[in-house]
Amino acid sequence: MIRAAEPLLSTLKQGRCAAYRRLCLRRHSLRTTVPFREFFVAHPAQRRWYPLVCVIAALVLLPLSVLLLSWQSIDGQIWSHLWDTQMPRLLANTLTLIVGVGIGVTLLGVSLAWLTSLCEFPGRRWLDWALMLPFAIPAYVLAFVFVGLLDFAGPVQTLLREWFGMGLRLPRVRSTGGVIIVLILVFYPYVYLLARTAFLAQGKGLMEAARVLGQSPWQAFWRVALPMARPAIGAGVALALMETLADFGAVSVFNFDTFTTAIYKTWYGFFSLSTAAQLASLLLLVVMVVLYGERRARGASRASNERPRGKALYHLSGPMAWLASGWCLLVFACAFVIPVLQLVVWFWQRGRFDLDERYTGLILHTLYLGIMAALITVSVALVLAFARRQAPTPTIRAGVSLANLGYALPGSVLAVSIMLAFSYLDRELVIPVSSWLGGAGKPLLLGSLSALLLAYLVRFITVAYGPLENSLARIRPSLPEAARSLGVSGPRLFFKVYLPLLLPGTLSAALLVFVDVLKEMPATLLMRPFGWDTLAVRIFEMTSEGEWARASLPALTLVLVGLLPVIGLIRRSAHRIS
């Protein structure tokens, strides 16, 4: 009987093994296809976020795909000319800027952060926040102020020749060292702010333990504070280098050739949009290398999450105290006080006579672009923040991360890629459809405000997403759940519960985007519609002609507007420490 049952048992075993294998294969397929399957098994309330996030991520990926496709057709004659005359200098200048600005912002930002956060000296309390004010000055404004001041025909050298004779001559300000110094003074606040926050957040017990063990302030800084602050310092240096690579206005003032100026000259000199896109892809590659290097240098370090403290650990006295005060005052004067005073002088001498109808038009154009870009960008960032909160699936998280990559794209790269994509759409879709419908058959997307607003959206969506995500994270899930239990849902839930709580973060995000759009030069210069000039474009036109005094009026306007988010940043920082 047992022998008779053996075939049946073997059949059952084989079937069970086959079923087990099928079950394993099914589980493996579910694990490997989660991003595709999760949409179908998600709750309907979560499923609606997928198409929105995918569309937003696609808008950010559009410039990247266009840059890759631009290599399908290469103009050998133009590239031969560029390689023989431009590329070696572009690569050398870019490497020089990366090394010089990277070292400079690190030394300057870390030294100032250490002094103002851990040391006590005369003037520390107001220098602590005053050193953040250079955030308000665009790089191209500080560049033309320094060139106008220190050039051979400027007031400084003219005065020195009157005092010491005609033979006295300072080193050329329009040099590699000059542009590096200006970019260091503009971008050191990134390192200063993040390093200062990291130093303040470090545990007081560690530093006191180092003092008990006989470590000097320098040894405690080098062995304890600096390694703990390395992630924050690395992030600040990466931001400074990204802004350096994306800069167009400052290097144009100094006649210093970089990839951004080469993109502009290729576009308007050779009239080759595809070659400009290929140069933009090389610039983007350099940006990615910088970001990868920052991540590798940071390693597995973790920033401290302790509460910031407000009391200094080291009380400087005598010459060291006044040396610390003098160093901080010198940086503050060079980066903010002297440039602003010189702008005021130029405004009174010449700039005030430009207060006419044309300047009113510049203000209106600038305000329109800033307000529209802020509304669109904040709205899209709200969608991403809510999608991340309501449907925290792998696909949504990946889509939100992709959508936030736009800030790493320089404005010139975005301009070239979007214009190339819109040129293709006009040629292959808009013009044929318009002609078929009996229209004029003219391009509608190329050179339109929609293209410029799309560039602003892609570049500054990260700026808006950060404050909104932080504000949304502070809202406890119990609040909307209680509102739903009372019958409040849909749009009423958003306007009655979420919006009042998100209002401070929303206003902060809108203000940050508004100010960044006002100061954005390369994307606005390359993509603006014909006759649609802004304050940044006006500054570029005047500085290109050496009209420093006439550029003072729009420059002062941008500086005053740029002070608004900086003041808010200072207030939040003071509130956290107190």
Model regions and ranges:
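Transmembrane alpha-helical segments of polytopic membrane transport and secretion proteins
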Residues: M1-V53, R124, E294-L330, G568-S578
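Feature of multi-pass inner-membrane transport and sensor proteins
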Residues: R16, P35-R37, L160, G203-K204, ...
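A short amphipathic helical element positioned immediately N-terminal to and/or at the very start
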Residues: P35, F39, Q77-W83, V344, ...
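Membrane-water interface segments at the C-terminal ends of transmembrane alpha-helices
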Residues: P44-D75, T85-L200, M228-F248, A276-R295, ...
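Polytopic alpha-helical membrane proteins, predominantly small-molecule transporters/carriers
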Residues: L91, G214-Q215, R223, I363
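Short glycine/proline-centered loop/turn elements that form peptide/ligand docking sites
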Residues: Q202-G205, I475-L479
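The alpha-helix within a helix-turn-helix
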Residues: A210, A483
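Glycine-rich helix-loop "coupling/hinge" segments at transmembrane-helix boundaries
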Residues: L245-F271, K519-W548
